[in-house]
Amino acid sequence: AEILARTYQLDESYYPELLKDVTDFLTQLTAMGMITEDLHLISSIPSVSMIIAGICIKLYGSAELISPNFKPFYHEFSDDDTSQEIELVTTPPPSRCYGQVLLQNSEMTVFENPDRYVVLFPQMQNLYEAHMLKDGTYVRVYCHPQVSETNIENLFHAIRLFFLFTAQRNGLFAIHSASVLYQGKAWLFSGHSGMGKSTHTALWHE
């Protein structure tokens, strides 16, 4: 706005009005999907820091929306060790600029943009969408601010998805399984959904 004012030799008294006009114009372009806002961290202080399988993650946003399932992994670490930052933003996204479809099924739709992936979760009503930089270092999840068991669980699954992306880039992978601790060792039972893994491990506990 200041550059425009100087270009057209406007008096400084016009600066506030000009700044508002420029901001409104950019907001309209963003809403129409003609431009996309830069994807960067908004918050300054993380709500939670945790380490999972050696991967250091910082979560930003409302601590009430973060699942207690993450508590066993809470751990402080230096900023230099951060592998991924995930930010929960409790407002709708400013635009609907999705890009090219990479994956689409009943659970999610993944779009590719020049600088990011955009993920929609059709079955999770409290999640508007999520934007992740292509290297996975930063994720912004647009979600509803309401704190409920369902909303927290949905966010847990979304956060897990983006963690697994970073894990894969670090040579790690996840196995769909159930496990029991027996004689000081973890025994892993792997198989597709519905095979009876949880039922089998429950029998071990009995």
What role is predicted for each listed range?
Residues 10-15, 148, 194:
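Short strand->helix junction
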Residues 180-206:
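Glycine-rich phosphate-binding P-loop
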Residues 5, 16-18, 23-186:
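A noncatalytic interaction/capping subdomain that flanks phosphate/NTP-handling catalytic cores
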Residues 1-12:
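Short amphipathic alpha-helical interface segments
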Residues 1, 29, 202-206:
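Short, intrinsically disordered, charge-balanced linker/junction segments flanking boundaries
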